[in-house]
């Protein structure tokens, strides 16, 4: 069957249809069309402003000098840097991590550096999911004027691994630490923030929580869980004056990432945490509410993906799979070389 298309006839019919719409309807449709076309432009402008022009919420909103901040996973990496920079801003610290000796060393260092700083420490292994540990945390912070909670504790896979080959202990630890540990800590600390009618909860997210990541499937799922949990919690605690924000990051030079060199796309912990604490509340161009990507190149990279192929598209998943297969291959070869040296 042959179809004959008359372009002029199609155009005339389209114009007739348009003219049959009441003028108010025409204006409404034109406005919707303009918004659709303008949305990427407005999103890019918001991205630029957030990255380079605007400052986030002043942390003094959450308490005067001497207010306490709780930091989990505090002895290394981003957690250690959050503790250091919060101390520099005048917050006393409750430091929670697995190794008491590391906590003691960090606490002494910060107290010597910042005159008048007070610290409290709690060694707990989040992978054990021990209710007694959370009871000790509740007892430790009882009576403290806490203004900030940083949910930084987390674990990823040792190397990219197919889900069917993931060790059961590793799978269990990732879910227990990233999900249960974050939730239970927040249940202990958040009532204090809500009672004082002001507070901030920062929870570390990840690109892997926004973009499905093969060969890191369990970690990716745990961070996606935190994304939705954090957005939901933000709505619940807003009437109580508590701001809840998910902090999205790509790669940072930490022990978890196993990356040592910085680059345009990979900041060090000091750079990343500085941006995280200075950009609180700048969430205008994000897919999810109450979420922000503080490091400028991470934010730009994420915006490009979301504005083109899409964060959850087949193309993005394929690229993530290829990248992590390559990382796994290199890691296994390195392990083989080291084994031969022994």
From Swiss-Prot:
Pathway of action: Lipid metabolism; fatty acid biosynthesis
Top-level taxon of the source organism: Eukaryota
GO MF terms, alphabetically ordered: ketoreductase activity; very-long-chain 3-oxoacyl-CoA reductase activity
EC number of the protein: 1.1.1.330
A UniProt-annotated Pfam family: adh_short
GO cellular component, one term: endoplasmic reticulum membrane
Binding site for NADP(+): 70, 125, 133, 152, 219, 223, 252, 254
Membrane topology reported for the UniProt record: Single-pass membrane protein
Uppermost EC category: oxidoreductase
Transmembrane residue ranges: 25-45
Catalytic reactions on record: a very-long-chain (3R)-3-hydroxyacyl-CoA + NADP(+) = a very-long-chain 3-oxoacyl-CoA + NADPH + H(+)
HAMAP family hit by this protein: 3_ketoreductase (MF_03107)
Family under the similarity heading: Belongs to the short-chain dehydrogenases/reductases (SDR) family.
Official protein name in the record: Very-long-chain 3-oxoacyl-CoA reductase
């Amino acid at each position: 069957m042959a179809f004959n298309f008359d372009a002029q006839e199609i155009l005339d019919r389209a114009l007739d249809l348009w003219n049959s719409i009441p003028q108010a309807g025409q204006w409404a449709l034109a406005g919707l069309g303009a918004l659709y076309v303008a949305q990427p432009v407005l999103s890019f402008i918001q991205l630029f402003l957030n990255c380079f022009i605007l400052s986030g919420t002043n942390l003094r909103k959450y308490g005067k000098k001497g207010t306490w901040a709780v930091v989990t996973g505090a002895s290394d990496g981003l957690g250690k840097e959050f503790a250091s920079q919060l101390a520099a801003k005048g917050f006393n610290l409750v430091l929670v991590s697995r190794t008491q000796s590391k906590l003691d060393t960090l606490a002494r260092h910060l107290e010597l550096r910042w005159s008048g700083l007070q610290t409290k420490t709690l060694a707990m292994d989040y992978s054990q999911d021990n209710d007694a540990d959370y009871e000790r945390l509740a007892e430790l912070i009882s009576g403290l004027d806490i203004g900030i909670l940083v949910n930084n504790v987390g674990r990823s896979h040792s190397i990219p691994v197919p889900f069917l080959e993931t060790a059961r202990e590793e799978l269990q630890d990732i879910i227990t630490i990233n999900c249960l540990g974050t939730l239970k800590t927040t249940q202990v600390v958040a009532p204090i923030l809500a009672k004082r009618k002001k507070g901030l909860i920062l929870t570390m997210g990840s690109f892997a929580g926004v973009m499905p990541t093969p060969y890191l499937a369990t970690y990716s799922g745990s961070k996606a869980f935190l994304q939705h949990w954090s957005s939901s919690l933000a709505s619940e605690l807003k009437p109580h004056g508590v701001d809840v924000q998910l902090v999205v990051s790509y790669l940072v030079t930490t022990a978890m990432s196993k990356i040592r060199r910085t680059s345009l796309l990979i900041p060090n912990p000091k750079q990343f945490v500085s941006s995280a604490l200075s950009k609180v509340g700048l969430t205008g161009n994000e897919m999810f509410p109450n979420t922000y990507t503080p490091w400028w190149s991470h934010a730009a990279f994420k915006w490009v993906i979301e504005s083109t192929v899409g964060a959850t598209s087949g193309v993005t998943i394929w690229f993530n799979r290829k990248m992590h297969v390559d990382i796994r291959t290199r890691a296994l070869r390195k392990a083989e070389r080291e084994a031969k040296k022994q």
